[in-house]
Amino acid sequence: LDDTFAPMGFRDENGELVGFDIDLAREVFGRNGYEVQFQPIDWSMKETELNSGNIDLIWNGYSITEERKEKVAFTDPYLENRQIIITLADSDISSKSDLAGKKVAVQNGSSTLDAIYKEPEIVESFDGGEPVLFDTNHEAFMDLEAGRVDAVVSDEVLARYYIQQKNPEDYKILEEDFGSE
């Protein structure tokens, strides 16, 4: 589990794992007579962790893609999510084409990364011809706030939660996105 994927799975102020996916997993496993143990992992290594037997399954934030279907078995999805573009409110970025020449942050190993590469002409227009990769979305947002990147592309559920916890007036979510999952 990615323990930085708020509001789905994250650590509260006491260091306890909480969130929608945590509650759902406990309920599903409990109803079936199983005890669940959560294992935070490096998200960019999720398939390696699964294939090596270090974890038994991936519960949260694991989007279904054609490439991933070839590697793992999925259940039915329980959430639809978009890959949205977030900037600071005072940014002049208002469309995907405005990302040209800009530093765009994305979580490494995420389905967001897969989604943006479905539009290679957009990615090639980024500053340096590729996104700036971060281990967590939280780190990407911190660099946005510090002015080290110009935009973040992230799961809508995480981004809206993050923004709501901060000051929503400080951010802008573009109408265009990089697709749904």
Where are these regions (language model features)?
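Ligand-binding cleft/hinge of the Venus flytrap
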Residues: G9-N14, A25-Y34, T112-L133, I163-P168
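Short beta-strand->loop
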Residues: L17, K102-G109, F134
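Short, hydrophobic alpha-helical packing/hinge segments within bilobed ligand-binding/sensory domains
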Residues: L24-A25, K46-E49, A140-D143, V149, ...
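Extracytoplasmic small-molecule ligand-binding "clamshell" domains
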Residues: L1-G61, L133
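Flexible hinge/capping segments at coil-to-helix
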Residues: T87-V104
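Periplasmic-binding protein-like
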Residues: D3, L79-T87, E156-E181
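Solvent-exposed loop/turn segments at secondary-structure junctions
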Residues: T4-A6, W43-M45, S63-E67, S91-I93, ...
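Alpha-to-beta junction loops
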Residues: Y34-E35, N51-N60, K102-K103, E145-L158, ...
